[in-house]
A protein has these predicted regions:
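Conserved AdoMet/S-adenosylmethionine-binding subsite of the radical SAM
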Residues: 47, 51, 201-239
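Proteins enriched for Cys/Gly/acidic motifs involved in redox and nucleic-acid/cofactor modification
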Residues: 1-197, 211, 235
């Protein structure tokens, strides 16, 4: 009764997996003939915008009786268009996603369109989506950060996801501990800009987080995604 479509980056993939687990915990399951379709959109380029629109319309056309839920960067800045032109049932952006299961339950009861968009991403806090289900793989992605402080002229991310916010250190460590216990040999830290971790003064710098992970857990490889050379803080301390 459930189908997820995730467009764009690794962060979107991670968030879709985490949300899928929340649905599973409420008794939903995946199927080829879904009653609920969740589309996690991307808006990093004009091409990504177009693809997001096409997917939403396609799923509505092919599944006229399904509940269509749209979330992500494209819906954050285009909720009115999705409401009026794509006929989606539930629209959230890059916040309020943790409430998506409850929104679906409410829609099943009331059949009333739900739009839950917070229109000031700069005030967003880190939204914890819980721990992802254990996939059948030796590599696991762990999200540690959301948002970006760079405000590049060509990029919409700070306007759709907000400025950098860090995930609680203990939550990161707990998720990695679970993954290591399940035999994972490769952990990939991911986020919109992982080196921005800790810049919101959460009490732990990015380099401190990496050092704690390396000291606590002895697994094969620790990788870091989505960081750049102009970091505002050292990535790692000297050995």
């Amino acid at each position: 009764m459930l189908k997820f479509i995730s467009l764009g980056c690794k962060v979107n993939s991670y968030e879709s997996s985490a949300l899928k687990e929340l649905f599973f915990l409420k008794g939903f399951n995946e199927t080829s003939k879904p009653d609920i379709i969740v589309i996690n959109t991307c808006s990093v380029t004009a091409v990504a915008d177009q693809k997001s629109r096409q997917i939403i319309r396609r799923e509505r056309r092919n599944n006229p009786n399904a509940i269509i839920c749209v979330m992500g960067c494209y819906s954050q800045k285009n909720a009115e268009y999705i409401k009026n032109e794509c006929n989606a049932d539930i629209i959230v952006g890059t916040s309020n996603r943790r409430n998506l299961v409850d929104f679906c339950v409410d829609f099943i009861k009331d059949k009333k369109q739900i739009i839950a968009i917070d229109d000031n991403p700069r005030k967003f806090t880190y939204e914890s989506l819980g721990t992802i289900a254990i996939p059948n793989s030796t590599r696991a992605y762990v999200k540690i950060e959301d948002g970006c402080n760079n405000f590049c002229s060509y990029c919409t991310i700070p306007y759709t996801r907000g400025v950098a916010r860090s995930r609680d250190k203990d939550e990161v460590i707990s998720e990695i501990s679970t993954l290591v216990e399940h035999g994972f040999k490769e952990i990939v830290l991911t986020g919109i800009h992982t080196a921005h971790y800790g810049l919101d003064n959460n009490g732990c710098s990015f380099s401190d987080l990496v050092e704690q992970i390396r000291n606590l857990y002895k697994f094969g490889m620790l990788q870091i995604c989505s960081t750049k050379s102009e970091n505002e803080q050292p990535l790692l301390s000297s050995p």
